[in-house]
Amino acid sequence: MKRAIGIAISTALLAMGAAGATAQGAPASAEPAQLVESGHIVVDGRQTAYVIHRLPTDSFPQLPEQVAAVLNERGCMVPQTYEAHRPENVIHASLERAGSSDWAALCSAKGTVSLMVFFGTALETPMVLATAPETERLQPHDPSGVLGFNWGIDRASPEQVHEAQAGMDQRPAPPGHDALADSRIEHRTIYHFYTKGAWTLLEMPDQ
């Protein structure tokens, strides 16, 4: 966010979900435990409340064991946007080349969020494409003024990339494999694309 943001004192981690299941007599493991962090940051000189929801890696059973192990070793939780209705910010796509089986995830650990990519050819050695303090990925989203997490990632197929490039004076042909869509809600989406052994940002029309 472009506004100056500073971290205030109060931050609390509250375990959710498991307590509700236990209260009804169900095993605590019946639902994945969702962590909720609440606190305050300074926005434009005023204390502003925020809430961040995160999920553990076992909320994503499709993750390969090697990927989950790396995320767990780094103490990662997966932050969820304030729009989330199901587990998000873990994707499976062909990011290295056409037909490859690759993964990407947002990792929240020690107050920092990192965008990590795991190629199928090297699942235990992820690449980090971007990092940011978690409190710099917050924005208001309802009349209460409480801030929520706004960073999301998605698979972008060649067709979706080509559609996003509509309106360019010299519109490129669709790329040869998936890109990684990197978005902040209500902001511009950027597209990471791996080609010739390096990551690049795909050109998009002015927004």
What are these regions (language model features)?
Residues 5, 17-58, 134-207:
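Acidic, small-residue rich beta-repeat scaffolds with periodic aromatic anchors
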Residues 111-117, 188-191:
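Structural motif
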Residues 62-97:
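Short N-terminal edge-element motif at the start of the domain
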Residues 1-9:
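Bacterial N-terminal signal peptides that target proteins for export
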Residues 99-101, 110-113, 124:
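Primarily extracytoplasmic ectodomains and periplasmic/lumenal surface modules that are beta-strand-rich
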Residues 117-134:
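Extracellular C-terminal loop/segment signatures of secreted glycoproteins
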